[in-house]
Amino acid sequence: MEHTVEHKRKWYKPQSTLSEVFLPVPYNGRFGYILEDTVRAKGIKVAKFTAIPEGKYNVGIRYSNSFKRNVLVLYTKIIEKNGYKEYVIEKDGISFTYVLVHGGNTHHHSDACLLIAKNANTSGEDFVIQGTMENELFHIISSYIKNGDTVIWKITNEPQKE
């Protein structure tokens, strides 16, 4: 069975992007907010300061040495290197490795990863999110993956929302 996470980018500032995330049935309505680095023009990447391009990505589980726990990871392909799996996103002529979904509060915590939280503050120079939803999201999505289901993360750039 295939499950799709809907990630809708709606608010944009020079250094950060704020989105709403919706989970597959049986969850109804917005699950939380995603904070990322800025969205750039197609094919443009500034390392650690660029959101991944809009599109569809596979979702997997990976142990993070930085966080010392399993986390969700987005990818378009997996490269085996010296016994390790490298999760890579290649799209529009640019690539990203280890795009994780984890907690954080500002775009400074992102480095191209997706930060998930319950609350968002849109005032101020940059977006701020609070109340991590990482554990809840991991529990839901990992249960699908552990059951052998496919999970797709679909990102859409919508027009700026007021």
Predicted segments with their positions:
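Cell wall/extracellular polymer interaction/catalysis modules
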Residues: 1-151, 155-162
